[in-house]
Amino acid sequence: MKREAAITAFLAGAALSIFAAEPGQNADWKAVKQSNGVVIYSRPHGGSNLKEFKAVGEIDATAETVHKVIDDVEGYTSFMPYTAECRVIERKRDSILTYQRVSPKIVSDRDYTLRIRQESWPVENGLAYLDRWEPANEHGPAAKPGVFRVTVCEGSWLLEPAGEGKTRATYSVFTDSGIGGPAFLANTISTTGINKLFAAVRKQAKNPKYQTK
């Protein structure tokens, strides 16, 4: 069970048939866990026994600050658990191409290259931010012996102002990290990884270097 949680925590941190819609707008979403102010939803994913997940929670920082944390891909090795390697291959105004390798120790390392597409728009009390990513392994390093190459890793972060100094964060993900075992176990353990992700981002958002000036 620990190895499933570790893998999920990583792929979450890097890291569509992904939607940032409210749970009430799609009857397929079902609440599966609530912990530490984070509500996690799941729904079936066509053609797979694995499920898509969406988590909604509040972060005590502005949306701009939280986005700076998520945008700090180069720094993931210092605050995203188990991240062994993370580098930017290409950064443009509205996208990032990044290679990431995660090392949960209890199974072999996993790696992938992602293309993250970024956008923002004005809303009440500031800007909302949306980052969406999908695999782009063909634009990254070749597969390495002994490292499992992840080919399914799609997700998004939606960050919305939620009052003074607060952000409503919606994280969505569908991934297959290549771990064997019953699908229901992998789906259950995924919720643990998502909670770890929120905890890491909440903690990092307190770092003064990300604060809005």
Task: Report the location of each language-model feature.
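Bacterial N-terminal signal peptides that target proteins for export
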Residues: M1-F10
